[in-house]
Design a protein with these regions (language model features):
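Conserved small/polar residues in nucleotide/adenosyl-binding loops
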Residues: 1-7, 255-259
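A glycine-/small-polar-enriched, mobile loop at the entrance of the PLP active site in fold-type I
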Residues: 11-31
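Active-site region of PLP-dependent enzymes
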Residues: 17, 150-156, 163-257
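Phosphate-binding glycine-rich loop
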Residues: 25-67, 81-83, 91, 158
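Short amphipathic alpha-helical/adjacent loop interface patches that line ligand
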Residues: 29, 33, 52, 72, ...
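Conserved SAM-binding loop
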Residues: 47, 70, 185
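PLP-dependent aminotransferase-like
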Residues: 60-147, 154
Length: 259
């Protein structure tokens, strides 16, 4: 399997040498965005160099202010992205069943400074997206999901990337789908030009050849990362099946263990 994938990747990157276009939203980058939109059943995918920058620049693009309710049970990046935007994280405890945010405790944490909720899907378990949506609508809050653990998951026929105002994915090499390093922001609808704003923010805030209208960063996914993503996406269903078999084996052995 590994030898086959290596040869497939070599074939994929030959186009990069032929085009002499190594980065800056080239053909592989654009192709991967389109393929992921189809796979995730979402209107828009914006690729980034890594998941952290995807989340940090998404928060910036949505102009959040004040306080953001999030979970302490997550990788450090989630909180760092909030703090690096000058916002205050307010931690909501998790429930003991699946370690996602305890929705019964969210409203008590909302103040007049709260602008958003950033829940985290954990170990493939989705948050209570319906309850969170109801709370957010009631209090006029944005919802951004850290979906790094749930690539490809569906709920009631909807892809995980379609919930909330937007979702962030990590495509780090440890994930079931990866681009070596990488990440993405996914969302439905136009949302006041969010795709264009994200495009600018990950490219130094450059809007066009003469206009720089935001303080941005260099967070573009390069062509070699995108090529790896295109290769891995073709085999993703098989990789998910492999992991499912491993989970089933662990569950069986632990369930029958005397320890």
């Amino acid at each position: 399997g590994d030898v086959y994938k290596r040869q497939e990747y070599i074939e994929e990157i030959k186009d990069i040498w032929d085009s002499h276009w190594l980065t800056n939203m080239g053909a592989k980058h654009n192709e991967l965005e389109k393929e992921l939109e189809k796979y995730l059943k979402v209107d828009h995918v914006s690729l980034f160099s890594n998941g952290h920058m995807a989340l940090e620049l998404l928060i910036q693009a949505l102009h959040l202010t004040g306080e953001v309710i999030t979970t302490p049970f997550t990788f450090a990046s989630t909180t760092h992205a909030i703090v690096r935007n000058g916002l205050t994280p307010v931690f909501c405890d998790v429930n003991p069943e699946d370690y996602t945010m305890d929705v019964s405790k969210i409203e008590a944490l909302i103040t007049d400074k709260t602008s958003a909720i950033i829940p985290v899907h954990v170990y493939g378990n989705l948050c209570d997206v319906e309850a969170i949506e109801a709370i957010a609508k009631k209090h006029h809050l944005k919802v951004i999901y850290d979906a790094a653990h749930t690539f490809g998951v569906t709920y009631k026929g909807r892809g995980v990337a379609t919930f909330g105002d937007a979702s962030m994915f990590s495509f780090h090499a440890t994930k079931v789908f990866h681009t070596i390093e990488g990440g993405a922001v996914c969302f439905n609808g136009e949302q006041n030009g969010l795709k264009e704003d994200l495009y600018g923010l990950k490219n130094f805030g450059i809007r066009n050849e003469v206009v720089v209208d935001a303080v941005g960063a260099n967070s573009k996914m390069n062509e070699f990362q995108a090529a790896m993503g295109l290769c891995n996406l073709r085999h993703l269903d098989g990789e998910i099946e492999k992991r499912s078999r491993v989970v089933a084996r662990y569950s069986c052995l632990l369930y029958t263990s005397d320890a």
